[in-house]
Design a protein with these regions (language model features):
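Terminal, non-globular segments
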Residues: 1, 33, 94-97
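Transmembrane-lumen/periplasm boundary regions of multi-pass, lipid-linked membrane glycan transferases
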Residues: 12, 44-186, 190-192, 196, ...
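Specific aromatic-rich, kink-prone transmembrane helix
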Residues: 18-34, 46, 193-197
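Membrane-helix interface segments
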Residues: 35-40
């Protein structure tokens, strides 16, 4: 839960569909190392739905980034060459699916760049920071704490999927928010990833702090 979700969850807009489809794809990538068929269908539905609901660029970025992270995670299976081969095939399939949704968006005229670069003024950047602070509260402090406590696992030769995957989703949504005219609705898609990062902070907190949060 966050303040931003509380504000927008009652509105019947494409942003809620985008939130649902992006969450479905996020689940697919998190579950793919443990299951195959269910996450495969979830990934396809998530990316196609995200594209058709008006966010084809984010669908492409989510898909390609996830494919790279999934490919980099092949070392986690050790010497299991069969599983490594499956991971490589899955990563290629995700990348091709991402490119396929982009072709679909182009054919339907959905891929329209609506980039509005922020002005180099204090009021512009102050408004962006304020949006990040209140919209994602209370997830963002815990998410930052997670990135700090797990920084060695994040910046390591061996990928830590449980940190890198939500960090990628949150980073892409935050960057898209910066150049999007509907910034709050774009930032809405970062909430599942930020909530995931925030959850990993709880085991590192003292018992009194965790009890206070509960």
């Amino acid at each position: 839960a966050s303040l931003g979700l509380a504000q927008l969850s009652h509105e019947a807009t494409p942003a809620l569909a985008q939130l649902g489809f992006s969450s479905l794809f996020f689940y697919a990538m998190a579950a793919l190392p443990y299951r195959r068929h269910g996450p495969a269908w979830a990934a396809a539905i998530g990316l196609i739905g995200l594209t058709l609901s008006g966010a084809p660029t984010l669908a492409l970025l989510f898909g390609l980034g996830s494919a790279v992270l999934h490919f980099a995670d092949r070392e986690s299976v050790g010497s299991d060459t069969t599983r490594k081969s499956h991971i490589v095939q899955e990563a290629i399939a995700i990348a091709l699916l991402s490119l396929g949704t982009t072709v679909l968006a182009l054919s339907l005229g959905l891929l329209r760049w609506k980039v509005e670069w922020p002005e180099a003024t204090w009021s512009e950047w102050n408004g962006f920071v304020q949006l990040l602070v209140w919209f994602t509260w209370p997830a963002w402090p815990l998410a930052l704490w997670t990135l700090w406590r797990w920084r060695r696992q994040l910046f390591n030769r061996r990928i830590s999927r449980h940190i890198a995957l939500p960090a990628w989703f949150a980073l892409m949504c935050t960057g898209a928010t910066l150049v999007s005219p509907s910034s709050d609705r774009t930032l809405l898609l970062a909430l599942p990833a930020l909530s995931t990062l925030a959850a990993f902070a709880l085991p590192t907190l003292k018992r009194q702090v965790a009890a206070l949060i509960d």
